[in-house]
Every structure is written in structure tokens, then in C-alpha cells.
Amino acid sequence: KVNYSQTRTNPQYPQWQGDDITTNPGSNKQVAAEIDRFAPVNSNKGVKDCWSDHYAIIKAANFIIQNASKTPTDAASLNQAIDQAKFWRAYAYFTLVRLFGDIPLTLTNENDDFTMKPSSVEQVYEQIVADLTSDECEGLPASYKNAPAFLNGVNVYVTKQAVEATRAAVYMAMAGWPLGKGTAYYKKAADEAKKVIEG
């Protein structure tokens, strides 16, 4: 729900550049078609939106992580907020690094003037893994019972399985190009996927 409300179809962009999905050449999806052909123009609104929408998620996540302790509430609620924020920050960076390569990596909102130098792909992936393997993300439940985490029979908040599935995707990406970490990371991906399958 957070993903769709904040990024709409933007997370599909890395898939359009691969073999998972393609666009209909007869459709009016020019924005997607340019990305599908690896030929987006400078004015491509989808690319601009993808960048700004995902950095908006990162900025919100950083704000929560930095300021949750100042909120007058119980420890369980604070930890839950940080859990969710770390996952969404990792998820946003994972989408961005696959699309753009080297990107600015910010873990605070102190430098908001857009002058940060890009971090390397490897540095970005290291932070993604750090967030997804943090104590907070490791402690997420398999399901929720009460609103707002659980609405209309659906887990709305991030679950343990969502983290494991995302880690599997991250390790798969790290195993191949451009990092080329190889067999060990394919095994990590398989191990995480097995956790999801086995519940």
C-alpha cells in the first residue's frame, strides 16, 4: 500500500529493463516504452517521478528513524515505526540503485541541498543489506492482528516474509552484474527464499 501510494508503477521500471515484463507497442505508455528500449529522454516524466518519489520515501524513513525516540509513546510502537522505516528505506534504495547505478546515499535529512556526491553501487547495496538485516527488521512479525497494521483481512505493515523476500531479491541482484559476488550470494538468496516458502 505504501509502495503503490508513493511510487505507483515506478517499481516496475527495473523489470522493464529486463526480461520480466514489456510494454505494448500499440499502447499510449510512451514513458514506459522509452525505458523498455533503454532510451528514455531527459524529459521522461516516469524517470523523474521514480527518482523523486523514492527519495521522498527515503526522506520520510530517515525522519522516522532519527526522530522516533522523541515521540511520547510506548517502546513497542517506536520499534514498529523504525522497523517499517528501515524496510522502506532499503526498498527505495534497491529500486534506485538498479535503475541509476551510483546514487546519493543519505541516512539523515541534514543535507537537503541536493549537492551530495553519489555513492558507489556497492556502498548502496551495503546499506540496503544493513537495513534489511538490522535487529529491527529481523524482529518483524509474520502477521498482524490489529489496525492499522492489519486492515480488511490483509497485513498492511511490512512482515517478516516481506523482509525475507526482499533480501532474496537483493542477494540475487548482488550475485550478478555489476557487483558479481557470485555463488555465495546466490546461496544467500536461495536461503532467504526458502524461509519465505517454509513460512
For the regions a protein language model found, what residue spans apply to each?
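Mature N-terminal segment immediately following signal peptide/propeptide cleavage
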Residues: 1
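Aromatic-residue-lined binding/catalytic grooves and analogous aromatic/hydrophobic interfacial grooves
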Residues: 4-37, 65, 98-104, 125-149, ...
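Conserved, well-structured interaction surfaces
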Residues: 25-100, 114-126, 132-150
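Short coil/turn and helix-start
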Residues: 70-76, 105-106, 180-183
